[in-house]
Amino acid sequence: MTFDPPLVAATLVRRYKRFLFDAVLEDGSDITGFCANTGSMRGLTTPGSRIYLSQSDRPGRKYRYGFELIEADGTLVGVNTSLPNRLAHEAIRAGLVSDLLHYPQIRTEQRYGENSRIDLLLSGSGKADCYVEVKNVHFIRETGLAEFPDSVTTRGAKHLTEMAKLVAAGKRAAMLYVIQRQDCDALAICADLDPVYGRAFTAAISQGVEAYAVKCAITPRGIIPACGVPVRLTV
């Protein structure tokens, strides 16, 4: 995916109230914008960091600028959690997850389970439909190892439980972790920050839920799913 219009560079002042951030544009203008990320963004909110912003003059939009990328640990990291579903779709279509090939139809936001929606539903291959839950990843604390989650995610544990129920009902279910950075070679579950998620992941895998991860190449011009990386299944 490409950013259109192009992103603008700025310096981060602070991120606050979960959805807001203050920054200084390169022309010295002070701005407040919207941060489409409800997570902790652990390690990605350091004041003074170089960031990249989308901009929109769409009528009814409260904030013109949106927080898209930040420079951290010598690499660009995507922070917009509204993008991973689209990136997952692109990754599957590009054949980056070999076990999810040969599904001609990909539908989004399909209802399943107890008042839940699946991010992607793969179908039409003559095989069992595959329910794909997409998660955004951008947390790294050990060189080369991306981790999820970066904070407690009650909804995430619930999703794993419901995915396991799908498998028990004879369906196929997979987690797809989209890593919005390129400086990693594997993904692990961060059970020390969220033990409940760690246990739910272990249980889901033991019951037949599949797990895959894709890392992305990121520039101020766009984000491209680059390749699959292994998921450590032992928590």
From Swiss-Prot:
This is Sugar fermentation stimulation protein homolog. It comes from Allorhizobium ampelinum (strain ATCC BAA-846 / DSM 112012 / S4). Belongs to the SfsA family. Gene3D superfamilies: 2.40.50.580, 3.40.1350.60. GO terms for molecular function: DNA binding. InterPro entries: SfsA, SfsA_C, SfsA_N.
